[in-house]
Amino acid sequence: MQIINWASLLLVTWETVVAAELPIVDLGYQRHQAIGFNSTGRYYQFSNVRYAEPPLGPLRFSLPVSPRNRSHEVVNGKGLGNICPQSQACWFNVQGDFVSAVTAGSTFNFTAAYDQVYQQDECTKPRPVADQNPLESEDCLFLDVYVPEKVISKRRDGNGKSNPGAPVLVYFQDGAYVSGSKSDQNPSGLIATSREDGSTGIIYVGVNYRLGVFGWLSGQKFQSEGGLPNAGLYDERLALEWVQRHITKFGGDPSRVTVMGVSAGGGSITMQLTAYGRAIRPPFAQIIAQSPAWEPGTKTPAIEDDLLDSFLTLLNVSSLEEARRLPSQALLDANYELVASRPYGSGVFGPAIDGSFVPDSPKRLLLERKVDPSVRILTSYTANEGFMLAPANVTDDATFNRYVDVLLRGANASVRAHTSRVLYPPIFNGSWPYHSQHERANLLWSEVSTTCNTRYLHQAVATPGYAIEYAVKPAMHLSDTSSVFYNGQGSSSSLNATIAQLMQRQIVQFVKTGNPNVKGDPHVPLYHGQAHVLSLGDNGVRVEPALTNTDRCTYWQQVEF
């Protein structure tokens, strides 16, 4: 086995290569040249490859359209690098202070933290221009392709015939459907791990998709005015179809595509699996769904219409058609302000039932197995998913019940009462898996929004899959991302280099073979029957029962809300 020199990956070394020597790929609509060669990782990077027309003007809030213009000009993506417009709910700032205090063993004054963020009314004011990332642009539907040197060189043999292609890993980023970009993660560690066995390695594709109001507005009123719900899902789908059409030109195998994502990225992958209720075969063979997140109880018709009305009010217009004609900066500002001002503890955007791409609740589609049964699945979740997302002000029954009302806004009074009294009762004597009101809210968010979703995925497909639990403390939502993309850097308490390298080997092995098990490493069990997972923690690696093997998960999949 080839040994990775992780210290060398600390330095991002881009070798100076004469432009004429960098590979060029003819995509039909443009000729795209690699922007550089990483001499440490031995891979080429093709940056900012356009996969859709700019979603501006009449294409705002509409289907993404494949590039129309044909050009023989060679481009390399330099000077583009746009990211989709970003935003974040202000209450996340309070939660960040809470997490920092608790993990440091300090006391946390919620009122003081809340007042500091909210009392000065910063969350309802327009964002200062200086705070905006200059790369933010509606023209953001680009992707990056990272290709190992040997994959490029072996695209064709000496007789001009195509060689068997390399496996492909497509990544959708996290960000609560309102932030993030294809550039958030550095895949150099994964690529290096994929070459440990002496093979050519894997191709990595990072994708931008529309966020916030640009990608996730929905509802009857929005549709009646010509808006397309779930535009972000259609962006992702077009990118996956782009991979199917073009990845052979980079040396990849379109029949060996794995889609990976965490949080919103994992939730998006779930929607891609259930898309159209199995009416159309998915453009991928495997998924790696990490903490697949969506909040099914937060999308009611009234909430959807209220979001649209609030957005139009911020723009000082009365219709979506008028919004389409406004300058881009006006929409960027309104998007930011709308998300920032959302009520404490509430989600804002995400997938919605639209009768087409999302024909029904994904949990119900999975229950009815309306998916391609041949798709192979690897899932993961963290042991403490809801720690940073359950509101810090849940300290008694009254605040817990208010949180239930926020999280399950689409549920009726009976479901909410059952949640508080039966599913998550205020019992803290050790007989339930929580010892405080915040831990109670933590478990509620975890099961409703992420962990139970992994169980639904496994039960929907024909072939038993695999599951991993990330238990390195604090093991909260997203804390495993630094391990997945470990490249020799990082010294935080949430990163264990041994665990990180193990996770990377498991991921790469799954991408290559559909099985995450590597000879000599701890065995990842099949997820079936009693549902066991491989738990990766500070105190060792062991097989344990899945946190999802509960009656509560069964209830959440079957109840209407």
From Swiss-Prot:
Residues 1-19 form the signal peptide. It catalyses: a carboxylic ester + H2O = an alcohol + a carboxylate + H(+). Substrate binds at S263. Carboxylesterase; part of the gene cluster that mediates the biosynthesis of patulin, an acetate-derived tetraketide mycotoxin produced by several fungal species that shows antimicrobial properties against several bacteria. The function of patB in patulin synthesis has still to be characterized. The pathway begins with the synthesis of 6-methylsalicylic acid by the polyketide synthase (PKS) patK via condensation of acetate and malonate units. Its main location: cytoplasm. This is Carboxylesterase patB. The keyword Hydrolase applies. Induction: Expression is correlated with the production of patulin. Expression is positively regulated by the secondary metabolism regulator laeA. Expression is strongly decreased with increased sucrose concentrations. This decrease is lost in the presence of malic acid. Expression is increased with pH changes from 2.5 to 3.5 in the presence of a limiting concentration of sucrose, 50 mM. Natural phenols present in apple fruits such as chlorogenic acid or the flavonoid epicatechin modulate patulin biosynthesis. Pathway: Mycotoxin biosynthesis; patulin biosynthesis. The keyword DNA damage does not apply. GO terms for molecular function: carboxylesterase activity. Pfam families: COesterase. Its EC number is 3.1.1.1. Keywords: Cytoplasm, Glycoprotein, Hydrolase, Signal. Patulin was originally used as an antibiotic and specifically trialed to be used against the common cold, but it is no longer used for that purpose since it has been shown to induce immunological, neurological and gastrointestinal effects. Genotoxic effects of patulin with dose-dependent increase in DNA strand breaks in brain, liver and kidneys have been detected in mice. However, more recently, it has been proposed that patulin might also have anti-tumor properties. Glycans are attached at N38, N69, N109, N316, N393, N412, N429, N496. GO terms for biological process: antibiotic biosynthetic process; monocarboxylic acid biosynthetic process. The gene is patB. SUPFAM superfamilies: alpha/beta-Hydrolases. Belongs to the type-B carboxylesterase/lipase family.
